[in-house]
Amino acid sequence: MDINERISQYRQDIKSDRVDMSFGEIINMYKEHEIVISPEYQRAFRWDKQRQTDFIESILLGIPFPSIFVATNDDGTWELIDGLQRVSTVLSFFGELKDDPVKNNLVLHSGNIVPELDGISIDSIPLDLKLTIKRTPCRVEIIQKDSHFEMRYELFKRLNTGGEGLTRQEIRNCIFRGFQNYRYFNDIISNCANNPDFREIVNISDEAQEKMMYEELFLRFFSLHAFRGYYTEKVIQDFFDKIMKQQCETPNKAIIDSTVNKFNQICSYLRPMGYEIFKLARLNLSTSMFDSIFLSLSTSTKDFSQIDCETFKSRVQALREDPEFKRNAGAASSNASAINKKLIIARRILLEDEAE
């Protein structure tokens, strides 16, 4: 297939339309559940009060802002797929973000251009300015329901990555919820991410936690432990996408159960060693260390719990200092070849007498 045929094929897979609507119309559609913001997407509303104030100020001053994107569901409703920060800001200011009471009822800060906005709420704003916000047009790009799912996913991913966008795990959390077994597999991920032992050995910031890093780390282990032989993608995040999509469509419950059991056993074993177990150079949490330790233990043919804590910690330190391991833990260390090389080294050092 040549380049023109390829482009023509994919252009046919996505069907779109556009319309200009006022924010008042968008607010009313949201109240009537005609525009839907999924809970998985809404949780990523993270603009602070100043950013929200800046956007309201921009509307009042007539400063242009980007379009929002919606996808048409089978029942005709629209699902917001880009523009969460802007739409949620307007909903919050008008007191309509009722599913998120902590972030609802925005009170503005001082604007960069209009400092008099400080302390203004929907109850105190002059009527003419309130109507200015409600009547301001917003370009809505509509992805029709007969667009191919893969293209809807690709669009969502591209629109929501970078800047104030979502992490890849947050995107997975949103986009795959339409699959029949999404709730089953996502509950597995959530339960493992909240394993108390896991939380003790993986120490991440509140911001990283909010961006679902615990969930992604479990998905990382699950994918590499159970399906490492199917890792052919150039980018490891695409591999995680593939595995999560497969398990949300047709979960392999036997593999899921055995992998979850392994995960829980490893977390319990590592807990006394603390979160520094995954440290490498300046990184408090190195994915090279995470992969090497978890995968070495999960693929061990012997009872790793018989290795006492201090012995294992000393072996981990030896792994950190191993020149060959450090070479493979550098750039491009998440490609399939590098992961396999690191695992061979890790098993030799951590398990001593076991080979890959």
Protein language model annotation of sequence segments:
Residues I3-D20, G24-E25, S38-Q237, E310-Q317, ...:
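Basic- and aromatic-enriched surface patches that contact anionic nucleotides/nucleic acids
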Residues E96, L224-R228, Q246-E249, Y269, ...:
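Amphipathic alpha-helical interaction surfaces
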Residues R183-Y184, I243-P251, A318-K326:
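Eukaryote-specific, cytoplasm-facing alpha-helical/coiled-coil scaffolding segments in long proteins
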Residues E207-K211, K253, L283-S286, A336:
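Conserved phosphate/pyrophosphate-binding and hydrolysis machinery centered on Walker-type P-loop NTPases
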Residues K234-R282, M289:
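Small-residue-rich helix-loop
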Residues G274-E324:
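C-terminal hydrophobic structural anchor segments
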Residues Q317-E356:
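Eukaryote-biased recognition of C-terminal alpha-helical segments
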